[in-house]
Amino acid sequence: MDCDNGVVSEISDDKELLNLETVIPPPPNDSGHEFIGPSSGPPQVTITPSGVQSGSANGVSTSQQQQYSAEYLSQLLKDKKQLAAFPNVFHHLERLADEEINKVRVVLFQCEFSKESAPLPDAEGDSTVHTEKVFVPAKEHPDYNFVGRILGPRGMTAKQLEQETGCKIMVRGRGSMRDKKKEELNRGKPNWEHLSEELHVLIQCEDTENRAKVKLMRAVEEVRKLLVPAPEGEDDLKRKQLMELAIINGTYRSGTDQSALAAAQLAAVKHQQQPFAAALQAAALQRGVLPMMANGLSRSPTMAVCGAPIVMSPSGRASSAGATATSQAALIMQQQSQLHAANAGNAALQQQAALLQQQQAAEYQQLLLSQAGLYDFSAMQQQYAAVGQNAAVAAAQAQAQAQYGALAAAAAANSAGNQQYADYAGVDLTSQQSAHGGYYVRRWA
């Protein structure tokens, strides 16, 4: 860049990556005094997305402010959530996303607090903690949400107020906790004495006494502005807070999304109404009236939901069209009557088939019962025969055992006598049966 007699000529390279605007102070005036601009430092250069630079006090150009929108902030938050799935991977992307989110949020949702801050005096003395209480008019406005208005979504409004005033903003007192049960349990305990007081905003400032008074005065003034209820529908701060909360929660819908949703709902309603319109058209045909879309008829602009359309004045071709519609209606009625007759015949055939099936089932059950009785009688006879055979076998076994016992006893008697007889005659004196399986007693002569 060459400068000659206050004339600046810009020399850009072949790539033309960046163009810089340099503010040249005007020449000295007639009085000989040099003009001093608003700031003695170097000019601030802000690079816009289009490559145009413009100075700005807060580092955000006018073109950027026009481009920022709630949809853009919602997209940035979604991108940040996607980056969170890869922790410690895209360090620069996370930092750039956070910076852009903060910048857009400041432009869109920054509360318009008073920018005229009183100059702070020089520090005198030691730093101490100074507090102020601003009571909330909850009794005058019991249905107004003062706590949410002061804190904002995720405490963003209170944080912004803390940054601008240099004080700490806290909501204390009865009704300051979201969990009412926990509030009742903690009331009266140490470090929870504020729950016994009325709802108020506690402002703390840690600084020297002379500087803390200035900070507290400004903070009290801004808090009192927030405690003035705005009319319904005219609260711009509440609108911004609700929009920011919806964006944070991911439930924000832009105007484009809402119009698309409305179009989808309308299409669904039309799709559901198509069967109803077809039913109305069929009813009109059955009554011998032309359908709604038939040519050659002029109807009233409004028509009842149910019933036939009102024919106001048929044209010249109405007679031929009416005859055609009548013949079509008669044909449809004939087809419907034939269909009903066929359905009735099918129903009668089905009833007859069902009766035949029931009769066959009853006969089959009777046959099964009779066969089951025969099978049971023969089985009983077989069981009785088996029992008789078992009894006969048992009696034969008992008789054989008795005979074997008698023979054994006779053999024992013969061996015990140990006498030899030349000839003898056996005479049966008595025959006694002493018990079951008894034996005969013989006397030897």
From Swiss-Prot:
One GO-annotated biological process of the protein: RNA splicing
Description of its domains: The KH domain and the Qua2 region are involved in RNA binding.
Descriptive protein name: RNA-binding protein asd-2
Pfam families assigned to the protein according to its UniProt record, in alphabetical order: KH-I_KHDC4-BBP, STAR_dimer
Keywords, ordered alphabetically: mRNA processing, mRNA splicing, Nucleus, RNA-binding
Residue numbers spanned by region Disordered: 22-63
PROSITE patterns cross-referenced by the UniProt entry: KH_TYPE_1
Subunit: Interacts with sup-12; in the presence of RNA, but with weak affinity in the absence of RNA.
Site (Important for RNA binding): residue numbering on this chain: R178
GO molecular function: mRNA binding; pre-mRNA intronic binding; single-stranded RNA binding
Tissue specificity statement from the Swiss-Prot or TrEMBL entry: Isoform b: Expressed in the hypodermis and pharyngeal muscles. Isoform c: Expressed in body wall muscles and phayngeal muscles.
Effect of a null allele: Defective alternative splicing of the unc-60 gene which results in decreased expression of the muscle-specific isoform of unc-60. Double knockout with isoform c of unc-60 rescues the motility and actin filament disorganization defects in the single unc-60 isoform c mutant. RNAi-mediated knockdown results animals that are viable throughout embryonic and larval development, and furthermore, results in defective alternative splicing of the let-2 gene, whereby transcripts containing exon 10 are not formed in larvae and so the muscle-specific isoform of let-2 is not expressed in body wall muscles.
Function: RNA-binding protein that binds to the 5'-NACUAAY-N(1,20)-UAAY-3' consensus sequence in pre-mRNA introns to promote alternative splicing. Required for mutually exclusive alternative splicing where it modulates the switch between mutually exclusive exons during pre-mRNA maturation. Involved in muscle-specific gene expression regulating the alternative splicing of genes such as let-2 and unc-60 to ensure that their respective isoforms are expressed in muscle.
Sequence segments annotated as region (Qua1 domain): 71-128
Organism: Caenorhabditis elegans
Annotated signal sequence range: none
CC annotations in GO: nucleus; P granule; ribonucleoprotein complex
SUPFAM superfamilies per UniProt: Eukaryotic type KH-domain (KH-domain type I)
Gene coding for it: asd-2
InterPro entries associated with the record: BBP-like, KH_1_KHDC4/BBP-like, KH_dom, KH_dom_type_1_sf, STAR_dimer
